[in-house]
Amino acid sequence: MHWILALSLLLLLWLLVASPRLAWLKAGLLSLLLLLLSAWGLVDRLSGDGINAATLYHLRADMDGAGVSDFSGYIAVFIGMVLLSLSPLMLLRVRRFRRPRGGGAVFGAFVVMLLVSMAVSPVYRDGKRLYYQLRPVDYATVVPEYQVPQQPLQKRKNIVWIYGESLERTYFDEATFPGLMPNLRQLATEAVDVRNLTSTEGSGWTIAGMVASMCGVPLTTAPGDENSMGRMGLFLPEARCLGDYLKDQGYRNHYVGGADASFAGKGSFLASHGFDVVHDVNYFHDKGVAPKHFSAWGVHDDVLLDDAWESFQTLSRAGQPFMLTTLTMDTHHPAGHLPLACKNQRYESPLGDIGLLHAIKCSDRLIGELVTRIRNSRYGRNTIIVIASDHLAMPNDLSDVLAKQKRENLLLFLGKDIPPQQVVRRAGSTLDSGATLLQLLEPGMRTLGFGRSLLANDAPPSASVAASRDSGRDYPRYLAYARTLWTGRSTRMLRVNGNGDVVVGVQQVRPPVLLEYDDDTNLKTVYLENTSRQFDRTHSDGTLAYVDRCTAFEDGSADGDWCALVVDRNQHMKLYRDPDLTRGIAVDAPLDVTPQAPRPRVRQPIMLTQAARKTEAGRYMLELYAKRRPTRAFWVEAVSSERKVVLAQQWVVPDASGRIRMPVGLEHAVEDLGIRAWLDYTEEVSVDDLALVKDTAVADRS
């Protein structure tokens, strides 16, 4: 396919210069195609699998804490490709066209080759794959397969779960990586060593690998944009995970990780599913750990695993059963990091002096030392240790080598009463890790979510089997069911709670939010980004429900209350106000059939202040100048409490110079005062100057 794409691009370039007819249109289309391919190339270098579920997840999830500097080389190449993608536009400025005839035929051929290029491009392939994975499907047949543990534990052993970042079992291959991981290879001979463990769709990145192994479900975007972690109150609230079950059994769940817990919603996941303590990079900063012990991603593994050992001792002495979970970081792609404890440790390899190999060698030693400490302690006899890769390695400095190997995840179980054995399964994935641990804790337990114990010879149907059979034809059913775990299945009632969050099923979402229902009033899509634009452009066969401040819908609203605009398939509309939303509204209730005006263009809030400011009580005059502004009047508000409380509001019309004046009265001091405007998505405002002047006399005259 690659050679066909390359040939198609060359033909497109020739057809561009073959005729001057519609030359700028052809150049623009070719540049757009090249930009798409460049963007795909960057994403593929980061994900290792093109545009997939991980890409969609991270586009919406909180990216704070990502070690962006590690990928500066990829980004530099991408910038170069972007500039190269614009070359067709530049070519028209230097090329003199000498063939004035045949323009129509040339343009027709150009369009055909453009379609061919798209059809053979990886962008189309990935788009088609995502469509089949995320399209609405009937998941009813797999609902009985989702099982949660109910049986009480007879023996409550302590658990230490060590996730090795991208530390797949493939690195055990002595022929390719001789002597790279002697400690974990030795531990594998003393453990239940699971082989052929794959990562299914929805489990191939860190948070997804944790969700898959601890909940037995793939992590997939909720319908639409619910994976905007900052806007979701709960992380997979309908899932029942290992942490939830163990907490009910009297366990204390403790997590210590070196990265920022807010990255990709990891902290939200842990807090939502039974973890009592979540320590991340900020914990180590607060402890006063020296800067030399941090990388772009967080604290190094030597400091992290020392802290894990201290936590193990503290938790063990307390006498309460516990699960201690830790996640290493220094083997993160693309090149890894080396902590101070391993600065003098090198790995000699025929592959060359590769930093990632040094990092893997170090991780093997540090994890091995922690495991030895735990097993040799007086608490080791009552402890099960799990050593697992969170996912297969993403593109890194060893990708070309790994591509030639049989890839498999790492999963080891060690414990006093666990006889060593190598378990080989034809269809096993990280979805089955938690269920396998449960069987080791309690032999009669063999399921967790869609996961099945890999020790059971009579395991019932599972998502792992579905993913490996018939090219994964039935696997989208499991993905579809997993998406319902974000909101639940009873989503036809909407209400706004006392915190100003929209309650949808079991989920709480911070507005604005646009919900799209199908013709049977089943929740189809939830939009949390660009909601105003989405509302204007979405023409549904079902019902739309848009929830935001009444200011978004009405010119005459000045109360800051919540409203919901519901539009049915016949374009009948009804605006529900705050009292209705407090009680709750049914989106499938009949709407008035009186003649309706055209669907309004809904406004959205745009912050005019760059940062919130602390402001004392008093009367103020807000003065701002905006050279670029809407041609019509619009709302300006002063807000506080994370933009939830409206302190002042005015329907403003800038004067000829763009000046806006609005009185603001504060009865008490405000810690986070901000100024925002309400505009529709086609409008914009650019503030050149803004001042909040405390002047009682001026405020009174206004």
Swiss-Prot record:
Q: Which Pfam families does the record cross-reference, listed alphabetically?
A: Sulfatase (PF00884)
Species in which this protein is naturally found: Xanthomonas campestris pv. campestris (strain B100)
A single GO CC term for this protein reads: plasma membrane
The encoding gene is: opgB
Location of the protein in the cell: Cell inner membrane
Q: Which pathway does UniProt place it in?
A: Glycan metabolism; osmoregulated periplasmic glucan (OPG) biosynthesis
Q: Which GO terms describe its molecular function?
A: phosphatidylglycerol-membrane-oligosaccharide glycerophosphotransferase activity
Q: Transmembrane region positions?
A: 2-22, 71-91, 103-123
Q: Which of UniProt's keywords are assigned here?
A: Cell inner membrane, Cell membrane, Membrane, Transferase, Transmembrane, Transmembrane helix
What does this gene product do? Transfers a phosphoglycerol residue from phosphatidylglycerol to the membrane-bound nascent glucan backbones.
Name this protein carries in UniProt: Phosphoglycerol transferase I
